């Protein structure tokens, strides 16, 4: 069990920022501090993508250091930053012989629910109202997995709000409340102000946006530097093919 002190995330991150630079990034001696930082991320509702992915890559390179509880925490934390690609990246850094363990499979199934924006199913799982089936044979375990991750449900609500902002023009208040897990009127108003929604018909309907009038073209340009490619090549295991 990884031990940490409350409020330790900032100190750990500051130390790790120095320790995981350059060729020292995947030094096995960093494992303990990385695991402590991941535990602090969960309890203090903080997140650092570099630390999360570095920990997973270090486990790949040093299988004897592998800790499933830390991997589970990282996967759950990456779900709190959806619709970002961190969850997909994290899955790619877990070896095939480990990723199908019962607990990790539960997290992956939960991730599938959220990636498909199936908020109705998520809230049933979170509230213990989901009937067991082939996908979730022990649905009560999902709520137990989420409990140690501070702010998990709030992160899902923010994710849902972002999806609503990009897919709806208007939405009935009752439907909005369901998508957000049954929040009260005060919380609905809070999200409406944060995301710029306008209450209409005495609050029965929320105007989200006229997407037809706000369409903008966007070019996505990503550049890979030589140092990026070099680091990947250096840390990629070489496989010998025998024909």
Locations of regions flagged by a protein language model:
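Charged, E/D/K/R/S-rich low-complexity terminal regions of large eukaryotic assembly subunits
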Residues: 1-47, 61-73, 77-243
